[in-house]
Each structure stands twice: as C-alpha cells, then as structure tokens.
C-alpha cells in the first residue's frame, strides 16, 4: 500500500493536462455539475473522497495521486483474489505487472476518476465471483450494493457487470426485486446528495442533455464519429497493445519492441499452459469472457475510443491475470524460463518510468496556454474551438484576454484592425493578417492522446 501511494506521489503532475482533468480539478473548489465541475453525471462518490483529501492536505496534484495510489493498491489486491478464485493458486507476478503497467500508472496521476472506478469494478467482480463460487448470499448483497456505488464513480464501466447481474438474476436465490432494491440503495448513497445540491429539475435536464449529447453530438460514439467501425476497432487494439501494455507501435521506441516480444512469449506460455482451472470454476471464466465482450461492444459503439485510450482499462487487469497465470505455469515446469522474466520486467519498468517522466512535463495545450499568457502583448485575442477556449478561460490570467471562436472571421479581423494581437490554433491566412510567429507544441501521445500536437499562430499589424 505504501509503495503504491508513494510511487504515485513521486510522479504526480502539477498542471491541468486536458479539459476533462480541468473539470475534475475545479470540482475540488466549487462542485457544480451545472457548470461542468465536473461534467455529468458528476461522479459524486469520487469527488467526495477527492474533496476530503484536498481539505486535509491542500494540494490538488497530491490529492489525485493519493487516490491513484489507493486505487492501484485495491486493483492489485482484488485482482490477486480473483485470480486465486479462478485457478485456486496465486500468481506472484500479477502484482508487479499491474504496479508497473504504463496506463494504470498514468491514470493514477491524472486528475480523473477512471482508476478509482476501475478499482471498484474489480472489487464488484470479486464479490460476484466469490458469491457464485461459494454460494455466499452476503457477498452477493455486497456486490449489488457496490454496483450502485460504481454508477456514482464511473457509470461507463457498468456494462462490464451486466453478465454478472443477469446470471445472478436467473441462477441465484436472491430474486430480481431484492437485487434491484440493493442496487438502488447503492445509487441513493450518491444520488440523494446530488439531487439536494443540484435540484431535481436541474439534474433531470442536464442528464437528458448530456445523454443526448454523448450519443448523438459530441461524445465520440459511432453515431457522431467520422471514423469507421474498422478504424475504431484498430484504435481499441492500439489502445490495449501500445497504450495499455507498452507494446510496439509505429513511431515508438525500439525498447517497446523488446517489450512486445516478452508479451508475445508470455501470451504463448499462457496458451500452452494446461490444467490452470477446474471444471467447477469454468463458469467464472465464461462470465468473465461475456463481460469482456459486452464491454468491448459498448466502447466500440458508444465511447470515444479514437482519442481516449483510458476506456480500455477494464480489460487490463484480466489480460495481466491470464498472462501471469501462463507465465507462472511455464516457469514452474521449465526453470530456465525464469531468467527471461527479469529483463522483461526491467524493460517494462524503463518504459513506464520514461512515460511518467514525460507526463510531468506540460501537455501541448498547457504549453500553448503558457505561451499566450506569458507573451508580452498587452491586448490579446485568443481564437480556437469552444472546448479549447473553455480550457484557457478557466486559468488565472484569462480576464486579460478576449476569447473568440476560430470561425468568427468578422470579429477577429475587427480586433486585428484595432491593434490587438491575435493568437489562433487555426491558420487564418484567408484574413490577410501579418503573421509574427507560428510553432508546434507537442507531448507524447502515449501519455495523453488528446491534443498531442497543437499549432499556434500569432498575428499583429505592428
């Protein structure tokens, strides 16, 4: 536990890396989902814990890293319990693989609720599996209650639990009505204060607007995306392999190629492993496969998998379980293979450490914010999309800048003629303005795929 928290504190970040992180950070100071602090559904359980920690220590970056460290510990602990339930023995390498996983570590420092949500999802999975395996009614009640809690932390992870819930409804002595009431009790834990803070009518209105927007306007679903199903599928594969496992992809370091050979060997080892589970536990494996398939279809169709690899994180602990099981099985049979694991873990450590080091440097949009705010021009106009404008507006110093939409050609040209300096993320050459500066800002897309490259143009008549 101490190692998980301390390591995440060491790699904490002290800047706002994207628009979603900004909304969660602002929720520590003034929680209001009507003002997108954070965005709907408000993540009240997560924000409550984050606010409590922030009030105790007074540091935004440390707050999210502490939660990330706690979440990492819970993921490791309950993943080992799940692994033991499935194969009836421990895999000592699983803890190391989860601890050093590049995406899990990255999200442990990000100002978001994803990793805390994943820890709850793993706990829910454990209690469902344990109740099914041991016929334990008490653990089943806990599982259903935690499903309700999970919806207040990371509602987009709920589809993963659908096969568990359906199986219990049809096979368990805990009937549909009782199960539903237990889940409702979990929901009411966070829904009651949310209604009190927001108002029922306001909450209803924003929920309808957000659900409609997510699926039909800006949420990155297959309905609104310009990318085909095949493109989305390839991005999911890239997210799992490159972002999630640190595997090789076009443009990546040769070290990730070495890491890839290791993953392939250990996956092969798993496929060759025999008698890794018993017949009476195969129902758990079948349920797990069903959950993975349901969640896969959900993100393929309805999540922004093109720009946000974090949507694949529910897959990672279970992939690492399978690999660690196969690895343990083969090493126990062929002692020589034991020496292969240490160079592999070292490569994984180097890749993850390097990404964490890069994560501590500001993202491209944060670099643009710093450039615009620190530039010595007095009268400033910043032009971009509404979402980029929103990011810059929330930072100290925005009161000295006028923000315009990048398509507002008339307004931009008018301010330019008045002597203002124009900063734009779009090339405005059609407006015949004198360009004074242009430059690209970058960050590693495997740290954060969103806005990994952004260009700024500066125009001034003088």
Task: Tell me the role of every PLM-derived stretch.
Residues 1, 92, 138-145, 184-188, ...:
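Signature aromatic-anchored transmembrane alpha helix within multi-pass, membrane-resident enzymes
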Residues 2, 66-88, 123-127, 265-272:
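Transmembrane-helix motifs of polytopic, lipid-linked glycan transferases
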Residues 31, 114, 153, 159, ...:
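Hydrophobic/aromatic-rich transmembrane helices and adjacent perimembrane loops
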Residues 40, 103-117, 308:
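Short acidic/glycine- and proline-prone juxtamembrane loop motifs at membrane-interface regions
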Residues 169, 241-282:
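Hydrophobic, aromatic-rich transmembrane alpha-helices
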Residues 178-260:
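Membrane-lumen/periplasm interface segments of specific transmembrane helices
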Residues 343-409, 415, 453-454:
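Membrane-embedded, lumen/periplasm-facing catalytic core of multi-pass transferases
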Residues 413-462:
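Aromatic/acidic, Gly/Pro-rich catalytic loop(s) in extracytoplasmic/lumenal soluble domains
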């Amino acid at each position: 536990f101490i190692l998980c928290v301390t390591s995440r504190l060491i790699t904490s970040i002290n800047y706002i890396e994207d628009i979603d992180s900004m909304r969660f950070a602002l929720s520590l100071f003034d929680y209001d989902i009507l003002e997108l602090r954070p965005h709907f559904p408000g993540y009240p359980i997560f924000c409550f814990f984050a606010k409590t920690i922030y009030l105790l220590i007074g540091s935004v970056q440390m707050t999210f890293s502490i939660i990330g460290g706690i979440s990492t510990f819970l993921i490791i602990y309950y993943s080992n319990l799940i692994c033991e339930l499935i194969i009836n023995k421990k895999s000592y390498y699983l803890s190391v693989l989860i601890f050093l996983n590049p995406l899990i570590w990255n999200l442990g420092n990000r100002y978001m609720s994803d990793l805390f949500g994943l820890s709850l999802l793993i706990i829910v999975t454990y209690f469902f599996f344990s109740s099914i395996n041991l016929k334990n009614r008490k653990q089943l009640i806990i599982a259903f209650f935690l499903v309700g809690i999970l919806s207040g932390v990371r509602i987009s992870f709920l589809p993963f639990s659908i096969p568990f819930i359906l199986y219990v409804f049809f096979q368990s002595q805990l009937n549909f009505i009782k199960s539903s009431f237990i889940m409702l009790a979990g929901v009411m834990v966070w829904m009651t204060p949310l209604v009190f803070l927001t108002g029922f009518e306001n909450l209803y209105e924003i929920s309808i607007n957000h659900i409609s927007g997510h699926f039909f306007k800006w949420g990155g679903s297959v309905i609104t995306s310009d990318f085909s199903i095949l493109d989305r599928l390839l991005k999911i594969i890239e997210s799992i392999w490159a972002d999630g496992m640190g595997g090789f992809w076009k443009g990546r370091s040769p070290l990730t190629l070495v890491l890839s050979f290791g993953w392939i060997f250990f996956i092969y080892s798993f496929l060759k492993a025999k008698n890794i589970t018993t017949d009476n536990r195969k129902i758990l494996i079948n349920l797990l496969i069903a959950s993975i398939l349901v969640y896969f279809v959900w993100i393929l169709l309805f999540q922004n998998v093109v720009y946000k690899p974090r949507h694949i994180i529910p897959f990672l602990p279970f992939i690492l379980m399978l690999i660690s099981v196969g690895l343990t099985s083969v090493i126990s049979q062929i002692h020589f293979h034991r020496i292969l694991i240490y160079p592999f873990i070292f490569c994984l450590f180097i890749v993850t450490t390097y990404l964490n080091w890069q994560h501590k440097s500001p993202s491209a949009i944060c670099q643009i914010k710093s450039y615009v705010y620190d530039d010595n021009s007095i009268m400033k106009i910043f032009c971009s999309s509404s979402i980029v404008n929103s990011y810059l507006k929330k930072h100290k110093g925005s009161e000295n800048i006028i923000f315009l939409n990048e398509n507002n050609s008339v307004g931009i040209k008018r301010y330019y003629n008045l002597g203002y300096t124009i900063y734009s993320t779009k090339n405005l050459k059609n407006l015949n303005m004198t360009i004074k500066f242009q430059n690209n800002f970058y960050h590693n897309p495997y740290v954060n795929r969103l806005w990994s490259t952004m260009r700024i143009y500066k125009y001034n008549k003088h």
